[in-house]
């Protein structure tokens, strides 16, 4: 199995070595996420999602310096910048909680035709399915929060592909989510090459793609999405 050395860009020291996942492993994760979403008995009620996100914010706040040091090491950034990044990530989680508390459907006006008299109609917001989040290297902690937390908040399983040079912050976030009560298949990291990623993007089980990166790559990935 091929391995990837995670380097500190500042001094080129090896921080850790992670194994590449093969195509079979990646698509097994996709299938688990898809089956999870299809099983309505396993949907997480809104109050549980809120509690999970609240505990996540508390955990990150308690160990903020550790996560800042980790992001700085794998990203090669000044520690001051990474500390700001972690603070922004915590704010991002709190914003998701606030939005979740106010997210609602709409009542549709009835009684304007004879057939709609004495009737009520409304819209209800529902999660759309499995989210694939392809992230970038420059803010490895906060960008994952921006992409994954909204998906989890509204009840969508999410697969996260971090930048190959900065996967450690992503792994830490996912471990924390599992630690505070999110079932494992709701949020999974995939660490694979671009060929496997391209096949994943075009799979019909992916309901939504969130991508952070160049315009060129973004439009290319968009063109590969399943109808």
Named regions from a protein language model:
Residues 24, 62, 66, 77, ...:
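Short alpha-helical
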Residues 49, 71, 93, 131, ...:
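Conserved hydrophobic/aromatic pocket- or pore-lining residues that grip, position, or stack substrates
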Residues 93, 170-173, 200, 221:
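Hydrophobic packing residues within well-ordered alpha-helices of enzyme cores
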Residues 1-119:
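N-terminal Rossmann-like NAD(P)+-binding subdomain of aldehyde/semialdehyde dehydrogenases
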Residues 130, 180-227:
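Conserved NAD(P)+-binding/catalytic subdomain of aldehyde/semialdehyde dehydrogenases
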Residues 109-184:
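Conserved small-residue-rich beta-alpha loop and adjacent elements
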Residues 19, 134, 159-163, 190, ...:
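Active-site-adjacent beta-strand anchor residues
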